[in-house]
Amino acid sequence: MSILKIQAREIFDSRGNPTIEVDLYTKKGLFRAAVPSGASTGIYEALELRDNDKTRFLGKGVSKAVEHVNKTIAPALVNKNVSVVEQEKIDKLMIEMDGSENKSKFGANAILGVSLAVCKAGAAEKDIPLYRHIADLAGNKEVILPVPAFNVINGGSHAGNKLAMQEFMILPIGAECFKEAMRIGAEVYHNLKNVIKEKYGKDATNVGDEGGFAPNILENKEALELLKTAISKAGYADKIVIGMDVAASEFYRDGKYDLDFKSPDDRSRYITPDQLADLYKGFVKNYPVVSIEDPFDQDDWPAWKKFTAESGIQVVGDDLTVTNPKRIAKAVQEKSCNCLLLKVNQIGSVTESLQACKLAQSNGWGVMVSHRSGETEDTFIADLVVGLCTGQIKTGAPCRSERLAKYNQLLRIEEELGSKARFAGRNFRNPRVN
């Protein structure tokens, strides 16, 4: 069925910054999608078009991207009479119209908004749930509920504390189903709140952009200790593992790393990639850390390769790979990591996101679907992770509605699947499909 009308507008993300929302109409009704936005962005990401008009939203408006949808993309798609089930055809058309390497003409945010709305409309056109439509587009017969990675302690560019490393996550891999994983996550979260309150005072339990706590600690090991204590207090030591997102590009300085980068600069405290790798190995040895994302800078290829070969854990590429098939192909060739972080707005279309996922999976990598720190109430990625069978998702702490929107949608999907629901559990790195 063809597209009758497309209307884009400026709305607000969870940080109070403008972002783009797209309404797409077919005879089946209205399909709405909103685009997220990141704080710690990789330099190789597709371009998020901002107005840079300092008199309006401090330069962060997206009225140009909105205009590109309303004045250029919308008329083209309506006139072309393409069917909303033809996801790849529509995405290709928009990418060709943009004509740039990184979607800088229209903005990845403009193209993605339309792409997401098309995908939702395509599912309705086929009278199937969105996750099933995504599974069809990806060629998957099965669907799998993911293990949630709850970001419960925030540091780095997501928090106003001294902590260098950006995210400390709990993964309830020992749960029997997604619903139980949510309960475990929530219970540990509340235990953690009490542990932090007792140790650092009530104001230390204020939450960061993704709903995690941001106590003013400097030592990354201290964050792991807090998690260990909360997990054991909740009684889930046998059911939970820990994941980290270091976001090391944020504190990479002239070939070295500054673990106190939020303090005045002092070169004498910089450490080498090898010293940083040793620190990680200590974490893995002393805590149940099974996954580390962005352990090194996005261009520090030798450090990535060495650590992935030596560590034996899941090493996740985010800034390194930016959901871009070309960067992923290079990382596969270099053996730089073994898991892709999939963020739809890094590449800017549903079709390319699916291609990135398939490329990673076909090379034996794991894939973790991810939100951004600036989120909306849109729940697309919940259906995406189920349809792509990646087995793992990170979309914040069990706190803040823009995070819970995704987790709650996953609860609904699990309920809808009933006895057919499969939960990735301990196989989260490679949930066997078919």
Swiss-Prot record:
Active site: E210, K343
SMART domains noted in UniProt: Enolase_C (SM01192), Enolase_N (SM01193)
Residues reported to bind Mg(2+) 1: S40
Pathway: Carbohydrate degradation; glycolysis; pyruvate from D-glyceraldehyde 3-phosphate: step 4/5
Cell compartment(s), UniProt: Cytoplasm
Domain of life: Eukaryota
Pfam families with a match to the protein in the record: Enolase_C, Enolase_N
Record: residues binding Mg(2+) 2: D245, E293, D318
Major site of localization recorded for this protein: cytoplasm
Cofactor note as given: Binds two Mg(2+) per subunit. Required for catalysis and for stabilizing the dimer.
Assigned keywords, A-Z: Cytoplasm, Glycolysis, Lyase, Magnesium, Metal-binding
Broad EC category: lyase
Record has Magnesium as a keyword: yes
One function term, GO molecular function aspect: phosphopyruvate hydratase activity
One term under GO cellular component: phosphopyruvate hydratase complex
Record-linked InterPro entries: Enolase, Enolase-like_C_sf, Enolase-like_N, Enolase_C, Enolase_CS, Enolase_N
One of the GO BP terms on file: glycolytic process
Annotated coiled-coil segments of the chain: none
Catalyzed reactions per annotation: (2R)-2-phosphoglycerate = phosphoenolpyruvate + H2O
Protein family membership: Belongs to the enolase family.
Subunit architecture: Homodimer.
Name listed for the protein in its UniProt record: Alpha-enolase
